[in-house]
Amino acid sequence: MKKIKLQELKDSEILEQLEEARKVLRTSRFQYGVARSLENPKVIHNTKKKIAKLLTIQRERQLKVNPGERKSRVLSRAKRKKKNLARLSAKVKG
């Protein structure tokens, strides 16, 4: 399924596709790792790519609904470090 077709899917259909792809990945990994009966190991790679595409589309839709969510979600490493240092110094003082 191409990305253009994936973009046209509804949210519920995307969730169904994700569920199905995860099942395929789980069974493929089992067949490859334990049973050694997987004919084409490339199936694992392609399924992982499909899952990533579906998750990307899902995230893009979330950002369209809440455009400010992205800014509040991501903190740079320096900001996290500064925040943790402030919290630790407050514990030492208090």
From Swiss-Prot:
Residues 73-94 have a biased composition (Basic residues). It comes from the Bacteria. Keywords: Ribonucleoprotein, Ribosomal protein. GO terms for biological process: translation. Residues 66-94 are annotated as: Disordered. It holds the Pfam family Ribosomal_L29. GO terms for molecular function: structural constituent of ribosome. One of its GO terms (cellular component) is cytosolic large ribosomal subunit. Belongs to the universal ribosomal protein uL29 family. This is Large ribosomal subunit protein uL29. It comes from Leptospira borgpetersenii serovar Hardjo-bovis (strain JB197). The gene is rpmC.
